[in-house]
């Protein structure tokens, strides 16, 4: 099983870049991140680190690509550190993660609800959404071409933000950034409260 797993991963990353799939070109923040914590960080750490950094910008100071996918990178980065005990990786990952969270708090945070806007984790195509988010007369498959998608607040995406706040606190603790640990924990708690308040159906218990 180990041989098959590593062989499959190496086949999917012939140029050291872990792809979303065999026929996909280029890199994608969400897919790289999920592949990293599913197995790649443990099985092929050198290619995983390369792939994770490939989706950052500004000299590894920010996470790039679609804004609603960016913060999932935080989970993959901390998982990589846990599996490889690479403190140098974590130091730079913390910078990119903290900077990106600060940017998204300014650009994608709905203060009225205390939730982040943007499509859900897996639905990057409009086919995953119903009306009125999906506009029947709009033939584009790209989700942001449908104006209603820009202000939605999805459960999966906001759960990722909650976990990212928790992991930013963990990163701060490991790296000795004591002044920010409490702030990230408080933000995680607030995020959890708002998810339960606005995205949890008590009657359906879901």
Where are these regions (language model features)?
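The feature captures the catalytic groove of carbohydrate-active enzymes
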Residues: 62-68, 105-186, 202
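Substrate-binding groove/exosite segments of carbohydrate-active enzymes
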Residues: 1-92, 98
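Carbohydrate-active enzyme catalytic cores, enriched for enzymes
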Residues: 200-206
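Solvent-exposed, flexible loop/coil residues
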Residues: 22, 32, 93, 120, ...
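Solvent-exposed, charged interface segments at domain starts and junctions
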Residues: 33-57, 127-148, 183, 190
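Extended, well-ordered alpha-helical scaffold segments
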Residues: 1-5, 44-57, 87-105, 160, ...
